[in-house]
Amino acid sequence: MPVRSGNITVTTQILATYPSYPGIRSFHPEHGRFLAETDLMDMERVVVLGRKIAERLFGAPESALGREVLIFRARFTVVGVMEAKGRDLTGADQDEQTFMPLSTYMRRAANQTWISGVYLHLDERADLDQVRQATGAILRARHHLEGKKDDFSMLTPADSMQLRKEALDLVQTLGAITSTISFAVGGMGILSIMVLMVQA
């Protein structure tokens, strides 16, 4: 999603969320503040920028506070800049995200009535399998999936790590295959030249 300030436009991932997000993700503002309950209730046009987005648009991250950016052809005021965090378990760069109130996104920006994902923060004593089953049951009921396959997926941090490992293994395997093919083609080329030289 493009975000613009003056003549500068950068691409960002918009994350529409609640004020509880920093506590759930252990990811907090370095400058300014995060989204407040009043922002959510009043559908305020405010955003919190990831560090890299703030740097690309305004230079020093702290200079982004109070400035306006253009998203969805609407003006939003920057109220905070997040701390540097790097990539998450899925490989997404969290410093290139932009946060806005969920209500603002759904009603004023995207005009949609559904959400694409939810983070759950579990108590250490919680049974992960029970939580997964209960969450799945709620989603299946809400999505009217009786007798049908799930139209959603649930990932734990361990699942994300496994998916990332499998993706890296696939890349390494493809790299090894490519190297082998290149070596074989190169060997055939050398053999052809040697045969030609012998025939000559």
What does each of the following model-derived ranges do?
Residues 4-8, 72-74:
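Short strand-coil-strand connectors
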Residues 119, 146-181:
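Peri-transmembrane interface segments
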Residues 10-11, 171:
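Short, hinge-like loop/turn segments at secondary-structure boundaries
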Residues 172-200:
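A hydrophobic alpha-helix feature that marks transmembrane segments and, especially
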Residues 4-5, 89-91, 164-167:
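Short, well-ordered secondary-structure micro-motifs
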Residues 13-39, 43-148:
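Mid-to-C-terminal secondary-structure elements
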